[in-house]
Amino acid sequence: MTELTDTTGACGEPVAVVGMACRFPGADDLQGFWRLLRRGGDAIGPGAGLREGRRPGGYLRDVELFDAELFGISPHEAALMDPQQRLLLELCWHALEDARIAPTAGGATGVFVGSCSDDYALMSRMSAVVDPYSMTGTARTFLANRLSYFFGFTGPSAVVDTGQSSSLAALDQALGSLRRGECSTAVVAGVQLNLTETGDRLIEELGAMSPTGRCHTFDRSADGIVRGEGAGVLVLKPLDAALAAGDRVYCTVLAAAVNNDGGGASLTTPTQTAQQSVLTEAYRRAGVDPAEVAYVELHGTGTKAGDPVEARALGGVLGRGRPADRPLLVGSVKTNIGHLEGAAGIAGLIKTAASLFHRELPPTLNHRRPNPDIDLDGLRLRVSTRRRAWQPDEGPLVCGVSSFGLGGTNAHVVLGEAPRREDAAAGPGEPAAAAGEPVPVLLSGHTDAALRAQAALLADRLDGRDDLDLRDVGLASATTRAALPVRAAVVAVARPALVARLRELAEGTHGDGTHADGTREDGTREDGTTVLTGRPGAQPQDRPETQPQDRPARGDGPGTAATAAAAAFVLGKPVDWLAVYGPRARPADLPLYAFQRRPYWLDTTTSAGGPAAEDAAPQWSGDPLDLVLDLTVQILGRAPGADLDLDATFTDLGLDSRMAVALRTSVARATGRVLPTTLLFDHPTPAALIEALRSDDTKGHEFR
């Protein structure tokens, strides 16, 4: 057995979980997942859609859908990207928003992703589709590096593969990185998509697949695993930093430990001694007496070999010394959603973190008669099969989460309840919001449809919520959300009027008066609200001369200041939002971004493999103007027919090196010509490229 080394430091500073997002079977988001767990929901079912005819499992809906435009990814590249990358991009965006961090903030954030599956890469290679985007689309390293690149994260960026314990092993690395000061914030993720039947057959050949299609953790009926899929993302900060910033804390991570069996009966047979060792070390590092642990989220796969070993290891470390009437409660989310393999650990951790936050333990399913090979009473263990609330006198709570990889890498994480604190009482001075004082509430989206969807979601969130201070809502809208190109602002004095204007924005009935400064306003209503819409960078000369001129001055009161701040936001100008909303405002929880997803999938009917051969007959003739414009717009991911500055360099237009290769390849394929790798270097603007393709020297010849 491999000896453990203390890489994080015994009793190191706790780390706070300040943001979470997930997409699991039967649950499209964190709230849906908690509802599924509380009601004891079973999300196992037969394959459907792209997985039609597959054996029962925990499947995600609509894995082909993705909001490529938001992330600046062309449709062509999106189709060649592993859906696991796409899923992580969207969930990372939501996890940051949940942590009240603007997704465009960037900074010294580390990214640690657990994954052990490459089904889309397998599909790509089997189809012989080779393209400039194939490497970045399917290589596993880009599960982490894609996040770091898009979000502007400068901390460590790593993919961890320890099999089924990958996501908890990734969390262990994140803890070490935070405590060493390599990053100030960490994003930890786990992802698993079961896109082909090959993975099913591999597990079946190993003898680990449940023939009944249900996970029976620690039960007499245990007959193997049920595969599941999904992803979860956590945002972590040092606890002191999170408390100082006023962050919501779901729970704390007190410690983690990872080891390996280092031998045993076989490569895939778990070892009790190693599991006991990793448990002992985790609680030593956390400074927690194992007898005080309230609950452990099991690895709990429901296999005949694995469950008894795990039970005996738990009983030997955490059950010892407990009175018979206070056994350790255990359970497994695999009974709800299946075994998520590379994402299994993070699924169990999100369940446990939510349980600590709500102080309520959801039931574990499919446990009716104990496994005869597991002496639950003697080990002081009890499977928690009913929903139960933790009582106030049971805190502060400590829980554990286990995840064991096929091949012997074991991980255990110790979680603690968030510190209990009361919000600072209002002191002397201005209240958070003076009655009747106008407050700007901001919205933005990458498309008009996204903006309307955000308005509808926010109206639903605010409707009937008398407890929400408009200044808190406004501050959150200004500081915890990305400021995207399509913008709107509502200046309101009361929640009902704000909700009414948001509904008008959602329905597109808010008016369209356009000012010379580029903003659009429907005028100040009798209820004191004003609605502004527009885009950053709008110029007065771009507007029709018949439109109204600048608004007349309305004095120097708060209404003028609020409207001026709203107009500045709409036009992309800087604003001191803390000064606008005041020092008492605290960001409220807002709806998460409404992605505008479309289907993208690998096209295996045609090969995308490189330019035509040198002796190929030309397949295209005509003016290259439309060809270059259409291909460039498509590769940039812009709407068909979008304007393009022909004299701007391809770099300034947004083409990176991979996009440049894709453009050269597409032009070559369309024209039937063999083009040099330096094509866009030699002709760096669309106008230059069009002229080169038009010249007599290139027609009917190789273009070198």
Regions found by a protein language model. Give the residues of each.
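Condensing-enzyme catalytic core of the thiolase-fold
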Residues: 2-433, 481
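Flexible, low-complexity linker/boundary loops enriched in proline and small hydrophobic residues
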Residues: 18, 385, 401, 415, ...
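Phosphopantetheine carrier-protein modules
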Residues: 155-157, 633-655, 670-679
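Flexible catalytic loop/linker elements that gate and position reactive groups at enzyme active sites
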Residues: 21-23, 42, 270-285, 295, ...
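Phosphopantetheinylated carrier protein domains
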Residues: 484, 640, 656-684, 697, ...
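Regions immediately C-terminal to embedded phosphopantetheine-bearing carrier domains
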Residues: 1-11, 520, 525, 565, ...
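Thiotemplate assembly-line natural product biosynthesis machinery
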Residues: 87-91, 613-642, 659-670, 691
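Phosphopantetheine-attachment site and its flanking helix in carrier
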Residues: 15, 83-86, 305, 410, ...
